[in-house]
Structures are given as structure tokens and as C-alpha cells.
Amino acid sequence: MRADGGTGGRAFSYGIKAGLVLAAALSGAVPHVLAQDRPPVRLSGRSPDSELTVYLMTMGPGKQVWERFGHNAIWIHDPVRGTDQTYNYGLFDFRQQNFLLRFVQGRMWYWMQGFSAQSYVESYRRANRSVWVQELEIPPQARRELQRFLEWNEQPENRFYHYDYYRDNCSTRVRDALDRALSGQIREGTARAATGRTYRFHTQRLTSNDPPVYTGLLLALGHPVDRPISKWEEMFLPLALRTHIRNLQVTGPNGGKIPLVRSERTLFQSTEPEPPADPPFWVPSYLLGGLVIGGSAFGLGVTAGQQRMSRTGFLVVTWIWLLLTGVAGMVLAGLWGLTDHTAAYHNENLLQMNLLALPLLWLVTRLILGSARAAKPAAVLAAGVAAISLIGLLLKPFPQFYQVNGAIIALALPAHAGIAAGVWRLARLQDPRTRRSPARASG
């Protein structure tokens, strides 16, 4: 099954994702500028290059998480051939050899392909996703070179590329192809222009409609996504590419500066609301969750000596939390050490999602079952896990620890602290030195 992969965090969010299936030819909903069914134009005395029109086509976000980042393509209108071809860099195939292994390793292969502009627009119209086009002011000879490049790029031996969620995705490929046609003027005008935003900023705001995915990405992404990015880098988002080229000036035929965008049109306007402009501030919610987990563990640990239900409850709470954090720690360590998912490298969340949670889980189970020998190791290890979580918080003032993970700390630290306190209480009950001896009867 072939799928339209889209951009950025969509692949990272779900990995294996279904895309749009191109629809049949449009039946009148798209303006007359689409000329797929018109005969070739016969020119008299004019260069065929001058008749080419190049558009940036941008598709707005959809409802699903993997659609929230938008999409884009390059549209070439060629009246000489009588064609309207849209070139899409966001395709992948579930049937590719070792597809799942490549995804896990961060070595996904995507490809580009041309489609009828009519059917392409119609597929997004049916999905209720906005479609905008911008006619670009590119010199005639460069338009022809761009068309040749895209046709070359579409050949089976040239179409595949190693997909990276932020640095080399379907939008950056469109950006780079246009920049190539303009002799590097897009990069020149945007590479040093700061945005004050980061890759994580955009990932958070665009996944805020799905809290589990939001949390998973907040956990999995490390330092690389928290540095400020330029306008050039921000064009990993199709809508950012659309915005930034709108304000860009390029060299015109007379040597002066002219706007890159000659005109803009909306081919279809979605009825869906726009994504939020900023990420949500959910730290209090995560803190509340951490306090509930930690408070429950501590309360159950205090009463576990007298009530069997409390011991069972303590075991359930600690099992769920420690299993989740231990497995999460394994995943984070694996992403950093064993894969090409560079966005997950140098992840401070390893101080919160601690691999030591797994041996602690085993010790806590033995402690609950009455093992006195497990009491001290369990208490020491639980305190160590909580201390490491606290260290993650105390390191935040230092400039080297700039990862945006306050919400994860707010969740993990109270939970680890509450479990450590509950384990310490149970360990004291199992320690023979703290058990009261039966009172001796007098005379």
C-alpha cells in the first residue's frame, strides 16, 4: 500500500500512517486554471520556457494527528504539453523491504512522484483540507530547468531519499527544489533570519489535539529540537514555507529586487479550525497527575502494614508506574544509542524515565510478598530513582540543560518521591529491628 506521508512529526508521531488516496479527475470544483484536459497550445515566436507557470501548492492541516502539519507540492503548468503536473515528495510504501525495521532505526525511505494537479486538489477537497497556490516569479529558463529537474528526480533511480522528520522531509525537499531554481536566493534570504521558535514549539502546538501523542513526543524528543531555528529551517512546515516565501524578494530580470510570489489563490477553504498559534501550557496538569500517583503510593504504603487491600493497591500503583517508566527509559536509551533518530539524542528525560525502575519493580514485588532481604535494597534503590529525578530538576538552571521537559519533570518527580516514601515505610515494617516484640505477661 502506498501512502502520502506528509511532513515532520507525523511520521514520528505514528510511524506507520495511512495517507491520502488520489481521487478521480475533478468535475468542476477547481478553477479553470487547471488545464489537464485542454489541448497543447501552439506558440508563435515565443519561447516555450516563458509559457511555463510554477506554483507552490500548500495543503492545510486535517483532523488526524498525522495531518496536522500540512503538506505541499510543486505544480508545473505547461500549456505547450497541455499538462498540469504536481510533484509530491511525501510518499512511502508499507511493502518496502524491511519497512518496519527501517522505521524503528530511523532510516525511512520516501520518494517523490508527479500526479495530475486536478486529482491531487480533489483528494484534499474531499478530505476537507484547504488548498492554496502561489504563483512564483522564477525566470523562464529556470522554470524549464526546474521542470527538467523534477522529471529527473521522478525517475525510479533518483526518486528515493532518506527521510528526516525535521531536516529532510517532503516540505524541505520542495523548498530545496525551488531554491535550486532560484540559485540559492531562498536560503540566502532566510538562513540567518531568526524565528525565536524551535522544532519542539511547532511539534507541541500541532499535536496538542491528541494528548497521548503530545506526551509521547515530549518524552521522546531530546536536545536537538530545542535550539532556536531560522526561517530556512522552519520551512520544514509547509505553512511556514508558504508564509516565508510570501515576504521574500528575489532578483528580477532587470537586476532589481521583486517579490518572489506573483499572486496567490485559494482553491479550497476548509471548514476546520486552524491549529493553535502557540503550544498549550499543561505543566499544572502533569503536576497534578504526578501528585496523584505519588500521593496514592505514599498513602497506600503508610497503611499497607495493617490492610491487605492497601498492600495490593500499593503494588498495583507502583507496578504500573515503574513498568511504564522503565520501559520508556529503555525506549529513550535505544532511540539515542541504537537508531538514526537524531531528534531523540541527548534526552534529559532519561533522568525521569529511569531504567532502574525495572529492577526496583522486582524488589518492590518481593517486598510486598514479605521478603525482609528485599527491604533495604528496595528502599535504597527507590530513593536513588527519586534523587536522580530531582537532579534533573536541579540541573535546569545550567545552560547545558535547556531541554523543554518541565511537564515531564512535574509528572515524574512527585510520583518517584511518593513511591520512594511508600517503599521506605514498607521496608521499615519488614525490618526485624523495627518490629515490636510481643509483650511479656507478668508473674
Question: Which residues fall in each region the model found?
Answer:
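Soluble extramembrane regions of membrane proteins in the secretory/endomembrane system
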Residues: 34-275
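Core alpha-helical transmembrane segments of integral membrane proteins
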Residues: 248-342, 352
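Generic detector of multi-pass transmembrane helix bundles and their immediately adjacent loops
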Residues: 323-443
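Intrinsically disordered, low-complexity coil segments
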Residues: 41-44, 50, 251-255, 306-313, ...
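Bacterial N-terminal signal peptides
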Residues: 17-29
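N-terminal secretory signal peptides that target proteins for export/translocation
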Residues: 1-14
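Intrinsically disordered and other compositionally biased segments
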Residues: 11, 20-21, 438
